[in-house]
Regions:
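Membrane-interface alpha helices of multi-pass inner-membrane proteins
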Residues: 149-154, 162-178, 184-191, 209, ...
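Short acidic/glycine- and proline-prone juxtamembrane loop motifs at membrane-interface regions
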Residues: 133-143
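Loop-to-helix entry region of an early transmembrane alpha helix in multi-pass inner-membrane enzymes
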Residues: 69-73, 81-102
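Transmembrane-helix signature of polytopic, membrane-embedded enzymes
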Residues: 104-128, 145-146, 281-284
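Extracytoplasmic
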Residues: 67, 339-472
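Hydrophobic, aromatic-rich transmembrane alpha-helices
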Residues: 101-105, 257-291
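Perimembrane helix-loop-helix junctions
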Residues: 2-6, 163, 183-212, 267-279, ...
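Extracytosolic helix-loop segments that constitute the early lumenal/periplasmic catalytic or substrate-binding loops
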Residues: 39-63, 70-73
Length: 475
């Protein structure tokens, strides 16, 4: 029976990996799952290639964003190596996805999972829609999550935290994404509950040293002003609106929307209730990861990419308990039914997305390339793909920074009022007041845009606006 059980798990893992590879290959030359947030990463990478960063703007007039330097710099290196922006972003995502899978396998083994349990961990992660979408998105979430999972794996191997490995990986995750604080908070929580606080103190000191060293290594790339911008925006000018109930509500919504995520959640909770894991770093890390994710998801602009670390650690928990679970037969049946079905669903869905007429954005890119005058785009990727530089990084933080009095963000509003832009590319109609009031650009940009520009057409689902021939008199 064991051979049959292990063989079935291996088969499901193969199906999950093949489905993921098929999705990546099908989407490789399209812009599927990339949006304005990916564009923010690309503009930061482009700025770095031109010696610019937040506080050191040049052709890019506004470089404020929530994203820290390491991942954009990785994308910049891939671009400098000769890849297009599309393929640099795709490659960065795939490499980060492979790192996360390797980290999850390593952490599962460190937690005591059997070889079959490790395969279950990988199958649960690879089959999940959240992982597949993130692996196409061109953003830092997978890289940061991979570092955090590696940190948890190191902690499982060094419970007293006498070495530097856990702190180094945890600091790397935090340097990649300022909200990636799973391991530091988990260590501090366990330290507060333990009689001996020395492991937590050792970790905190080493974490600080590695983090400072990481910032120092990036000083030639304006890392101080870059991190200062990311922190100040996160803490004092967060984009969009927030609601405390949104975090847990979003988690429940995703669990209700994706059967494979519900399966991971049930298996992880079952595993964490077992006595063997009650004092494990894996338990505190998973709980903290979920808590952090819900806190971030309270912001209405946050999406399921913030659940990647939680997904990976939950998958590790499920793999650890695979051989000892009292409901292992039920778990096997659920894995055999749910994961292949999820793979089938996502393969066909992404095949449709990739075949859609606007998936390659050829029309909107051509329009941006052909315009001789200055262009402003809600999704900066449109401009980079057209061989241009974008004046902004992020329309969401542009709104919040302008409201906070940032002169760089306010300058974009002034230029819009002066009808400086020969072409403005929006993701939806400018009349969508709720979207542009609460999420992107804000009234400071959109009111003069509506007054001084008119819709001149559509391209690949984007709305094109050009200056009005005659501006109507103010009322």
């Amino acid at each position: 029976m064991r051979v049959t059980r292990d063989g079935a798990v291996t088969a499901v893992l193969v199906v999950a990996l093949v489905a993921w590879v098929a999705i990546v290959v099908r989407a490789w030359d399209t812009w599927v799952e990339m949006n304005h947030a990916t564009g923010t990463v690309a503009v930061l990478a482009d700025a770095a290639l031109h010696g610019e960063a937040a506080g050191h703007e040049g052709a890019s007039e506004y470089l404020g964003a929530l994203y820290a330097p390491p991942y954009p710099l990785f994308v910049a290196a891939l671009k400098r190596a000769g890849l297009s922006w599309l393929h640099a972003l795709r490659s960065g995502s795939v490499v980060s996805a492979l790192l996360l899978l390797a980290a999850a396998a390593w952490a599962a083994r460190a937690a005591g999972a059997s070889p079959a349990g490790v395969r279950v961990t990988l199958a649960l992660i690879a089959a999940c829609n959240l992982f597949k979408v993130a692996s196409l998105g061109g953003r830092a979430d997978l890289l940061a999550a991979g570092c955090s999972v590696l940190a948890v794996g190191a902690w499982l191997r060094d419970r007293e935290l006498k070495g530097w490995t856990c702190a180094a990986f945890a600091a790397a995750g935090w340097l990649c994404k300022v909200s990636e604080v799973t391991t530091p908070l988990a260590v501090l929580c366990m330290g507060a509950l333990a009689r001996d606080a020395r492991p937590a103190v050792r970790f905190a000191l080493r974490f600080a040293v590695v983090a400072l060293a990481g910032v120092a290594l990036m000083l030639p790339l304006h890392s101080l002003s870059w991190y200062a911008s990311a922190f100040s925006t996160t803490l004092f000018a967060p984009p969009n609106l927030s609601n405390k109930l949104r975090g847990p509500a979003e988690v429940l919504r995703y669990i209700g929307s994706f059967a494979e995520l519900a399966l991971v959640a049930v298996m992880a909770v079952s595993a964490l209730l077992e006595p063997a894991l009650r004092r494990s770093p894996l338990r505190s890390s998973t709980a903290v990861a979920l808590t952090v994710a819900m806190a971030v998801l309270a912001n209405r602009g946050a999406d399921h990419n913030h659940l990647i670390t939680t997904l990976a650690l939950a998958g590790v928990c499920a793999g650890v308990a695979w051989e000892t679970s009292a409901a292992r037969t039920f778990a096997l049946v659920a894995v055999l039914i749910v994961l292949p079905a999820a793979c089938w669903r996502d393969v066909w869905a992404h095949a449709r997305y990739a075949a859609a007429p606007g998936a390659r954005r050829e029309q909107v890119i051509a329009a941006a390339r052909a315009e001789p005058g200055p262009v402003l785009a809600e999704d900066p990727l449109v401009l980079l793909a057209a061989g241009r530089r974008s004046p902004i990084t992020d329309p969401a933080t542009l709104r919040s920074r302008a409201l906070a009095g940032d002169p760089r963000a306010q300058r974009i509003a002034v230029e819009t009022a002066e009808r400086h832009w020969a072409l403005i590319v929006l993701e939806t109609d400018a009349a969508n007041e709720a979207w542009y009031r609460d999420f992107h650009f804000g009234d400071a940009v959109m009111q003069p845009l509506r007054a001084g520009y008119e819709r001149a057409g559509d391209a690949d689902g984007f709305a094109l606006y050009r200056p009005r021939a005659a501006v109507p008199p103010a009322r």
